[in-house]
Amino acid sequence: MKSGRYIGVMSGTSLDGVDVVMAVIDENMVAQQARYHHPMPQALRQQILAVCQGQSLTLSQLGQLDTRLGRLFAEAVLALLKQQGLSGEEITAIGCHGQTVWHEPQGEAPNTLQIGDNNQIAALTGITVVGDFRRRDMALGGQGAPLVPAFHHAVLMHPAERRMVLNIGGIANLSLLLPGRELRGFDTGPGNMLLDAWIWRQQGKAYDKDGAWGAGGQIVWPLLKQMLSDPYFALSAPKSTGREYFNLGWLEQQLHSFPGLPAQDVQATLTELTATTIAQQVLLSGGCDRLLVCGGGGKNQLLMTRLAAQLAGIEVTSTDKAGISGDDMEALAFAWLAWRTLSGLPGNLPSVTGARAASVIGAIYPANRSLPL
């Protein structure tokens, strides 16, 4: 087992910045030691959003975006090291998810694309990087996502309590940690993605702080009913989705039949959409004793209130109360996946992704010094 000090880097679908964590990891523990949030320049965020929403660009532009994002990830890692007074030689490896700009698990040639050049990160930090985690699972017939349920199982599984872990990033995904049952996990649908896109369009704000704007609106029930009829919500697991599907274009298509709605009412309805699609999947999966929430959506008080209202009898609380930071969950997961890759251990779960087999996942980008194998 390649135990040591690992760094995890995560830039999620919400595009609010780069989360970097450091943890000591071995077969018995994941002990977080530090965290750092690195802001994403607005121009870079807008470029990534444009790509995710299908705007055409040249191969040169895509290559430049890949390089710039890799440099940003390296800056974030170096800032964390400076904060902690550490050198790159004291880190075993970095696990970097990259920025998903396209995810297409269905069809004749399933594919997924994460950018943020890992070669840049390895060269600029002097630390071995493990990245490109999703495509091996996809090559084995899986969805390539979600990958975090394996980490949820490792750190949050309880021998008796029936738990589910809900990550609300741009997309919301659910991990079913039910004693005596096979581990399953899947994307329920939009998390913060449509909420963030709509408030950005209307007010130029990155997100609806505490859900305050949405709380002042009224739910438009006919619009909600129409949105809930989208075929994705009726799909059986394994399933995954992303910004290439649930985006402003999708929302505008939904709003076409409802001209002139107050913008605040649309926000309230989108909040209810996220709460309802999550709650439906929790209940369809048999319910649980405790729903542990992580990700930025857990800070949206309106969303949490609406979710709890639809899950009477289930304790809805943060993963912080179970000992794992809700803000850092995904970055920790990719640090842990890097440890598994360097230890020669499988990182995907066929029961979650639908892959034909479990496999070591991720590509290794050696540091300038020798590879730590």
Swiss-Prot record:
Database matches in Pfam families: AnmK (PF03702)
The keyword Transferase belongs to this UniProt entry's keyword annotation: yes
Group of enzyme by EC: transferase
Enzymatic reactions: 1,6-anhydro-N-acetyl-beta-muramate + ATP + H2O = N-acetyl-D-muramate 6-phosphate + ADP + H(+)
Keywords, sorted A to Z: ATP-binding, Carbohydrate metabolism, Kinase, Nucleotide-binding, Transferase
Domain of life: Bacteria
Known EC number: 2.7.1.170
UniProt-annotated binding residues for ATP: G12, T13, S14, L15, D16, G17, V18, D19
Record-level Gene Ontology MF annotations: ATP binding; kinase activity; phosphotransferase activity, alcohol group as acceptor
Gene Ontology terms describing biological process: 1,6-anhydro-N-acetyl-beta-muramic acid catabolic process; amino sugar metabolic process; peptidoglycan turnover
Pathways per UniProt: Amino-sugar metabolism; 1,6-anhydro-N-acetylmuramate degradation; Cell wall biogenesis; peptidoglycan recycling
Matches recorded under HAMAP family: AnhMurNAc_kinase
Family note: Belongs to the anhydro-N-acetylmuramic acid kinase family.
Function: Catalyzes the specific phosphorylation of 1,6-anhydro-N-acetylmuramic acid (anhMurNAc) with the simultaneous cleavage of the 1,6-anhydro ring, generating MurNAc-6-P. Is required for the utilization of anhMurNAc either imported from the medium or derived from its own cell wall murein, and thus plays a role in cell wall recycling.
Name of this protein: Anhydro-N-acetylmuramic acid kinase
The encoding gene: anmK
